[in-house]
Amino acid sequence: MKIQLIAVGQKMPDWVKVGFEEYQRRFPKDMPFELIEIPAGKRGKNADIKRILEQEGKAMLAAAGKGKVVTLDIPGKPWTTEQLASQLEAWKNDGRDVCLLIGGPEGLSPECKAAAEQSWSLSPLTLPHPMVRVIVAESLYRAWSLTTNHPYHRE
């Protein structure tokens, strides 16, 4: 199983790249973790946000291919570390790649939400999208460490 984090936005600050890559490199070879960046639509005073969301959504779903789509969205289900570890095991048993979608400033398109088999909420707070990349990477690594009795996770 491969995990893909499909996120709207490019040209992230260095701390985002460094933080994400720190956890990305720790994943085992049999569970590669990859970041796919979708260019954000041009936003401005007269931008057609509905059209931009639609274009970003199409690009995200195209990148997901036949993988299991899981959106990161405030109304989603919050998981504890233990619940995320169980999800990780269930995803492995499913046999498909897992595609986690992070939307842009206006969130995810209705098409992405409709395509999602699951929706995960990190917090009821609105989080900066660059920070979400790092939080997701660390959370998934921690969940993996729990499933393999790796000493990274401590109770």
Curated annotation (Swiss-Prot):
Keyword annotations from UniProtKB, A to Z: Cytoplasm, Methyltransferase, rRNA processing, S-adenosyl-L-methionine, Transferase
Gene Ontology molecular function, alphabetical: rRNA (pseudouridine-N3-)-methyltransferase activity
Record-level GO cellular component terms: cytoplasm
Taxonomic superkingdom: Bacteria
EC number(s) reported in the record: 2.1.1.177
Residues holding S-adenosyl-L-methionine: L72, G103, L122, S123, P124, L125, T126, L127
UniProt similarity note: Belongs to the RNA methyltransferase RlmH family.
HAMAP family per UniProt: 23SrRNA_methyltr_H
Database matches in NCBIfam families: PRK00103.1-1 (NF000984), PRK00103.1-4 (NF000986), tRNA_RlmH_YbeA (TIGR00246)
Subunit-level organization: Homodimer.
Protein's job: Specifically methylates the pseudouridine at position 1915 (m3Psi1915) in 23S rRNA.
Name under which the protein is recorded: Ribosomal RNA large subunit methyltransferase H
Organism of derivation: Actinobacillus pleuropneumoniae serotype 5b (strain L20)
Origin organism lineage: Bacteria, Pseudomonadati, Pseudomonadota, Gammaproteobacteria, Pasteurellales
Gene encoding the protein: rlmH
